[in-house]
Amino acid sequence: MTGKEENKQQQHVNFPWKRLVAGAVAGTADVWACHPLDRIKTQLQNNPGKSIVGTFGDIVSKGKGFTGGVNALYEGILPMTAEAIFKVGIRYFAFSWFTEQYKTTVYKGETLNKKQQFGANLLGGAFAGTIESFVVVIPCELLKVRHMTQEHNKSFGTVFRDVLREEGFQGLYKGGSATLLRQITNHMIRFPTFYAISDYLKGGDHSVHLPVWQNLSAGAIAGTASTLFNNPLDTIKTRMQKQGQNQTTMQVVRGIYQETGVKGYWAGVIPRILRVAPGQAITWAVVELVMGILEPSSKKH
C-alpha cells in the first residue's frame, strides 16, 4: 500500500490529548453562543404550560441591575464555561482513547470498514457519555437546574453549599440515572451520525478537512437527531433535579404523564433543539477546526 493510500484510509481519531484541547476550546465556544437558549429550555421544562415568549419575558424581568434584563439570559455563564471546558474536553478525550483501544484490542490495529467503524463510534460515544456524566455532567447539571429555577438570586457557590448542607454529597447526583442515560444516548447518536455524514462528504478520505459550513451542518444534524430521540430523558432529569423534588425516576415518569400526558415528555423539545442543534454545530466545527491546526498536514476541500 502506498503512502497516499495509507493516509486516505487513516481512521478518524488519533492523539487523545489533541482531542482534549479541541474539545475544551469547542465547549467554551458552545456555551458563550448558546447559554441563553439553555436558560429558556430549562425554564420551559419546569413550567410546561408557559410559552417560549412568556418564559423569555420571565427571565429578562427577573433580577435587578446587572442581573436584570437581557443580562439575565447570561446569568451563571462563567461556571457553565468552566463545566464545558472539562466536560467537552473529557468527552472527546474519552471517545478518542476508547476507540483507539478498541481498534487495537479487537481489530489488532487493522483498518476498519464502514460497518466496523460505525460500531466503534457507537461504543466510543457510549463510553464518552458515561465518563463525562460521572466526572462532570451529573453534579453540574443539578447545580445548573437549581440555579436557573430558584426563586432567589443565589450565586452558584451558594447553591452548591446549600446542596451539600441539606442533601450531602450524594445530593449532587440526584437524578443521575436519567442524566447518565441521556448522555449515553446523546453520544451514541452524535458521534456515529457526525462521522457518517463527514465520511460521505470526504469521499472516504479521512485526511481531508471539510470546510466549516459542512462541519456546522453535520454537527447540527447530529445534535437534532439525538434531541428528538431522548428528550423524555432530559425532561425527567430536569424534574428530578429541581429543588423539592424527592421522587424516584418512575414516580417522576408517572407524574409527568398524569399532569400533561405523553406530550409532557416532550416539554421544551423545540427550545432544546434550538439550543442543541447550533451548540453541536459549533462544537463539531470548532473541534475539527482546532484539529486542523494541530494536524496541519491534512488536506482541505
UniProtKB/Swiss-Prot annotation:
InterPro entries: Mitochondrial_sb/sol_carrier, Mt_carrier_dom_sf, TXTP-like. GO terms for biological process: fumarate transport; succinate transport. It is found in: Mitochondrion inner membrane. Residues 38-65, 139-174, 230-275 are mitochondrial matrix. Solcar repeats lie at residues 14-101, 116-200, 210-293. Pfam families: Mito_carr (PF00153). GO terms for cellular component: mitochondrial inner membrane; mitochondrion. GO terms for molecular function: succinate:fumarate antiporter activity. The chain crosses the membrane at residues 20-37, 66-86, 118-138, 175-191, 213-229, 276-296. It is a multi-pass membrane protein. Keywords: Membrane, Mitochondrion, Mitochondrion inner membrane, Repeat, Transmembrane, Transmembrane helix, Transport. Its main location: mitochondrion. Mitochondrial solute carriers shuttle metabolites, nucleotides, and cofactors through the mitochondrial inner membrane. Belongs to the mitochondrial carrier (TC 2.A.29) family. This is Mitochondrial substrate carrier family protein Z. The lineage of its organism: Eukaryota, Amoebozoa, Evosea, Eumycetozoa, Dictyostelia.
